[in-house]
C-alpha cells in the first residue's frame, strides 16, 4: 500500500528517539498514542515499542493487535508503514473490521500458513509476554482458532487423553479452551510465571485442568497452590495416577503419597506407563504389590520388568517417611538429592549376577 504524506509525517515523528512530554498532546492528536504511551518506531528494524513490550513488536504483530481491537486508525497507519494487511485480517473478529481489511487489500480467504506461522512464532518465543499475547490474539477469534485447532488438535487431544480417564472431561473442552490449555502447558513447562498467573487468574473454569497439568509436569509448588489455596479437588488416587504418567515425577508423586494416595496403585500405574524410575520410587515408598505388578507386566509383555519384580532384594527407604505433611519446601528439600535405594539394589544384584 502506497503511504500517504500524512502517514509519512507520522512515521518521521514516531521515529524520534526522545520527545519531551510537551509533545505528547501532539502525538495524541496525530493518533500516535497507544496503551497510554506514545507510539515509538524503530525504523532500522521496523519495530513498534510499547510500554509492555520494551523490546518492540514487529509491524505485522502490532497490526494484528490493532485489528483484534478494531482500531481502524492504527490498522491503516501500520499498513501504510509497511505491515502486511493479511496479518491484520487474521485477527479481524468483526465483519466491519474484515471489510476494512479488504478495502486495504487483504485477501478474501484466510491464509492458513500465515496463521500457523504467527502462532508458532509467538509460542516458540517462550516468554510470558508472547504467550499471553498469542492467547489474546487468537482466543475467541473463530477464524484463526479454527485453523490452529485443526492443526494441533489431534496431538493435543491424545496428549490430554493420556492424562485423564474421564472422556467427558475431554468432550467438554471447546476449541477456545483447547487453545488456552495449549498455551498454558507451554507456559507451565517453561516456568513462565507471569503467563501462568495470567491463566490462573482469568480462566477459573479450567482449574481442574490446571491441577492435572501441574501433576503431569511435576510442578510441585503449582500443585500445592492449586490444591491448598484454590481448593481444587479430584480423587487423590486419580491425582497419583496422573503424576505417574511421566517418569521421574517424584515431587508430585510424593505430594500425593503424603496426602494418602495408594502407593500400590501408583506401582501398577508406573508399569502401565512403562516408567521404571517411578516404579523403583514406589518401592522405596513401601509399595509391595509385587505379584499383581508382575502379572500386569507379563500381560503387557514387559518381561524385563517382571524379572526385576521377581527378585527378593527390595526394601522401603526409611528416609522417605520422615515427613508427615504436604509441605512443598520440605518435600523439595527431601528429594533434591534423592537416589533410589531399590534401583541401587537391582543394579548391584545385576552386576554381581553378571560377574559371578
Swiss-Prot record:
CC per GO annotation: host cell membrane; membrane
Entry's transmembrane regions: 206-228, 249-271
Keywords from the named record: ANK repeat, Glycoprotein, Host membrane, Membrane, Transmembrane, Transmembrane helix
Ranges of the ANK repeats in the UniProt entry: 58-90
Pfam family, one: ASFV_360
Topology in membrane: Multi-pass membrane protein
BP-aspect Gene Ontology terms: taxis
Keyword Glycoprotein carried by entry: yes
Residues with glycosylation annotation: 125, 352
Source domain of life: Viruses
Compartment annotation: Host membrane
InterPro entries hit by this protein: Ankyrin_rpt, Ankyrin_rpt-contain_sf, ASFV_MGF360
Reported function: Plays a role in virus cell tropism, and may be required for efficient virus replication in macrophages.
Similarity-based family: Belongs to the asfivirus MGF 360 family.
The name this protein goes by in its record: Protein MGF 360-10L
Amino acid at each position: 500500500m502506497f503511504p500517504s504524506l500524512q502517514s509519512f509525517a507520522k512515521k518521521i515523528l514516531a521515529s524520534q528517539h526522545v520527545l519531551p512530554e510537551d509533545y505528547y498532546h501532539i502525538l495524541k492528536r496525530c493518533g500516535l498514542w497507544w496503551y497510554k504511551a506514545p507510539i515509538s518506531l524503530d525504523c532500522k528494524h521496523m519495530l513498534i515499542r510499547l510500554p509492555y513490550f520494551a523490546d518492540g513488536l514487529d509491524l505485522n504483530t502490532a497490526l494484528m493487535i490493532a485489528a483484534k481491537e478494531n482500531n481502524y486508525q492504527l490498522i491503516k497507519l501500520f499498513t501504510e508503514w509497511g505491515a502486511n494487511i493479511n496479518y491484520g485480517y487474521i485477527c479481524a473478529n468483526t465483519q466491519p473490521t474484515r471489510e476494512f481489511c479488504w478495502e486495504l487489500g487483504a485477501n478474501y480467504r484466510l491464509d492458513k500458513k500465515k496463521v500457523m506461522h504467527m502462532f508458532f512464532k509467538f509460542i516458540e518465543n517462550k516468554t510470558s509476554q508472547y504467550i499471553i499475547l498469542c492467547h489474546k490474539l487468537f482466543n475467541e477469534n473463530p477464524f484463526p482458532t479454527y485453523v490452529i485447532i485443526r492443526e494441533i488438535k489431534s496431538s493435543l487431544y491424545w496428549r490430554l487423553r493420556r492424562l485423564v480417564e474421564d472422556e467427558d472431561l475431554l468432550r467438554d473442552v471447546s476449541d477456545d479452551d483447547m487453545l488456552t490449555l495449549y498455551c498454558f502447558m507451554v507456559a507451565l513447562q517453561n516456568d513462565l510465571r507471569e503467563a501462568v498467573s495470567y491463566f490462573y487468574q482469568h480462566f477459573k473454569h479450567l482449574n481442574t485442568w490446571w491441577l492435572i497439568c501441574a501433576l503431569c509436569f511435576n510442578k510441585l509448588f503449582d500443585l500445592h497452590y492449586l490444591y491448598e489455596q484454590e481448593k481444587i479437588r479430584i480423587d487423590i488416587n486419580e491425582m497419583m495416577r496422573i503424576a505417574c504418567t511421566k517418569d521421574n515425577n517424584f515431587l508430585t508423586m510424593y505430594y500425593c503419597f503424603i496426602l494418602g494416595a495408594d502407593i500400590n496403585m501408583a506401582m501398577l500405574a508406573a508399569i502401565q506407563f512403562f516408567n521404571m524410575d517411578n516404579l523403583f520410587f514406589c518401592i522405596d515408598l513401601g509399595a509391595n504389590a509385587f505379584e499383581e505388578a508382575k502379572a500386569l507386566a507379563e500381560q503387557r509383555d514387559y518381561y524385563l520388568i517382571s524379572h526385576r519384580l521377581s527378585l527378593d532384594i527390595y526394601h522401603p527407604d526409611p528416609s522417605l517417611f520422615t515427613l508427615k505433611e504436604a509441605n512443598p519446601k520440605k518435600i523439595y528439600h527431601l528429594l533434591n538429592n534423592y537416589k533410589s535405594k531399590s534401583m541401587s539394589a537391582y543394579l548391584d544384584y545385576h552386576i554381581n549376577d553378571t560377574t559371578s
